Amino acid sequence: MALILGITGSPRKGGNSEVLLEVFLKETVEATVKVEVFSVRDLKISPCLGCRFCEEKGFCKLSDQMGEIYALFKQADLVVISTPVFFYGFPAQLKALVDRSQALWSRRYKLGLRDPKSPWRKGVVLAVGATKGERLFLGIELSSKYFFDAIGAHFEGVIGAKGFDRPREVLGDEDFMYRLRQRAKELLFPLTRRKKVLFVCKHNACRSQMAQAFLEFYGGDRFEALSAGDDPWKEIHPMTFQLMAEKGLDLYFRKPKHIEDILEDAPFDLVVSMGCEVSCPMVPGKRFVQWDLEDPIGKPIEVGREVRDLIEKKVKELLEGV
């Protein structure tokens, strides 16, 4: 299922920005999607040091909860930020999260790596301010534009409410609430129409990971791609990162999954077995395909490149055939 990631940026509990997110996410009840929500005030996120470490290494040197957030950004199909306006910008807690996304910007623009979901991921901001200034949301719009670009998402704009200060006061604006619900439906609807494809191999450490990434990159608007294995490793094989980096795709924040972890997404429209040396688990699906691909792990990198290119070709053929 598609993942909707909701982020509340207010340092205050129960305020208007939380109400906006609640109303927006109510539209997911009837949609077949997953929802995960967190408040930045509950996280320990240090401010960016401006040290440029991420520009050289591709990851942040600071060790805190931001590491978990990076992974969530990469899993999400839609990122929704709900925030109050503080001096025409984000509150400090949310600004720290935005600044720390420099690490993802570095992976894209310094290392030349694209997240496979980035062509299709979307981001939107719900904002509420106590005043009614003509340019009340200008600062947030500019920051959001570059933040969403950094995490690999198309910025869908700010849905803003002006003149609300008391907790939950914004609920009284019925016209705004209607517009908010309608925009939520518009953003959620395409995610519920995609066909689900599962790629399966034994360890979910190489072939199935590459297939998932290629389908996400080339056809993420029409397909929801997943991958899993019946004996998953703890980490993706290092060669897989190298092979996909040669194609400009970034798998750094991904982990192998057990087949049981994705059964909640069943049934699948298509299940593709990559070529199991032992026995791949059976999962609920409408159609099953066997690709019989060689396992490149433990073999020369040239073998890995041949398998990778064959997977890419097969994914493109799959897209052309639908």
Where are these predicted regions, by residue range?
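Phosphate-binding/catalytic loops
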Residues: 126-133, 163-167, 280-322
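Glycine-rich phosphate/pyrophosphate-binding loop and the adjoining helix
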Residues: 138-194
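Conserved active-site segments centered on acidic
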Residues: 192-261
